[in-house]
A protein has these predicted regions:
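Nucleotide-activated sugar donor-binding and catalytic core shared by glycosyltransferases
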Residues: 1-412
Length: 412
């Protein structure tokens, strides 16, 4: 099986280099990896290294509370953060708490051996998933203390299939599994793993910390002007279709809208703006304008959404009607009632939990969207009830960072 995997890997690497000629994201994926070993030249043989690996931005945010806690406690250690995806690397490549941020090398035997030899980590921390066979074989071979944090396992994964022996064996590289839920523990137990702790999701610690920071934005204060405001975050075209229908046909003068699209491509932003029949302004055009005169504010930049959620009376979180639901924990920590699309949310534990608790609502079409947001606008006590459920859920699920740190302190 190792031979077949490595042969497929070789063929995929050639294919990716070809696709990179025509695809910008794949080009970043391929070209970025050419810089990995140069970036690692700053790591010396005498350095003590802690290595984190995240697939993309969401997984990085799960690891961030641990990175911050380790940086505070182990000031003389160097921290290396690797990403698989350009969407994570491009946004966090200048993360100031890491000594090196780079792409994870392509999973060939020679690459991973060179990589592990170069960084010689005291501990390897894999976030949520990313089970690369050659990489896991190498850390196991070198006896590196390796842990999985915020892990989730599902029945459909190959580990739990009759033909999954190859991947099951790779899990032996982990010294400990820190999982999000009981279901994942049960699954791992069925294939013989007992080195498991249900720690929960470190993102809860991260979002709770958000409440301690200054979340004020002067331009949002000016725009909102104490008016009822719906914040729609990380929206896709499928979400925006429902949102625009509501704004154009049902919104009254006493409600405002802030839209932060997932894709801030200039052409798509302009199309969104032109589809709205209410007075609308873009973030990129806000200077010198009277923001309070506008009813819709489109945020055509990144990095502001978390703070903007603090201004929401209600929130719509995008992705649930498209490729997958985005982060609902951020609006939840502010005690905001949340609505999202009903098609692609079930793999997100927090979404299924909050749906059962009643803190969130789902929609699939324009009629449902209009009905739920009209009800939320007209019933303040309804909004308060949902928001309280969400905020309580966040506070009751913190503590994963401390649990994981207690283990790391014993091993470093």
């Amino acid at each position: 099986m190792n031979f077949i995997y490595n042969l497929l890997l070789f063929k995929v690497s050639i294919l990716l280099r070809f696709i990179a000629l025509f695809n910008k994201k794949i080009k970043l994926f391929v070209d970025g990896r050419k810089q990995t070993f140069n970036k690692l030249n700053s790591i010396q043989k005498t350095d003590k290294v802690i290595w984190f690996h995240a697939a993309s931005l969401g997984e990085f945010e799960q690891g961030r509370p641990i990175i911050e806690a380790l940086k505070e406690r182990y000031k003389n250690h160097k921290i290396v953060v690797t990403f698989f995806s350009p969407s994570g690397y491009e946004i966090r490549k200048n993360y100031n708490l890491a000594d090196v941020v780079c792409y994870l090398p392509f999973d060939t035997k020679s690459n991973v051996k060179k990589f592990i030899d170069k960084i010689h980590p005291e501990i390897a921390i894999i976030i949520k998933y990313e089970f690369w066979p050659n990489l896991l074989s190498e850390v196991r071979k070198q006896g590196i203390n390796t842990i999985l944090i915020s892990g989730i396992f599902r029945k459909k994964q190959s580990f739990f299939k009759w033909h999954g022996g190859f991947m099951r064996d790779k899990l032996n590289a982990f010294n400990h599994f820190y999982l999000q839920n009981k279901e994942s523990k049960k699954l791992l137990s069925t294939i013989g793993f007992e080195n498991i702790t249900i720690a929960g999701d470190t993102r809860f610690d991260r979002v709770l910390d958000i409440l301690k920071q200054d979340n004020s934005l002067d331009f949002i204060n000016e725009f909102k002007n104490d008016t009822y405001t719906l914040v729609a975050g990380s929206t896709w075209k499928e979400d925006e279709k429902l949102l625009v229908n509501y704004i154009n046909n049902h919104a009254l003068a006493d409600e405002k809208f802030i839209i932060a699209p997932h894709n801030i491509n200039q052409k798509q932003i302009k199309e969104l703006q032109e589809s709205i029949n209410k007075k609308t302004i873009l973030y990129s055009e806000k200077e010198g304008q009277n923001l309070s005169e506008n009813q819709v504010f489109i945020i055509d930049t990144i990095g502001l959404l978390t703070k903007i959620y603090s201004y929401a009376d209600v929130a719509y979180v995008g992705g649930g009607l498209a490729t997958g639901l985005h982060n609902i924990l951020e609006p939840a920590t502010f005690g905001v009632p949340i609505v999202f699309g009903a098609n692609k949310y079930k793999k997100f534990q927090e979404a299924t939990d909050l749906l059962k608790l009643g803190g969130v609502k789902t929609v699939v079409n324009e009629q449902e969207f209009t009905t739920i947001f009209t009800s939320l606008k007209n019933k303040k006590e309804f909004r308060t009830k949902l928001g309280s459920i969400n905020q309580k859920y966040i506070s009751e699920n913190t503590g994963a960072t401390k649990t994981i740190m207690d283990y790391i302190k014993k091993t470093l």
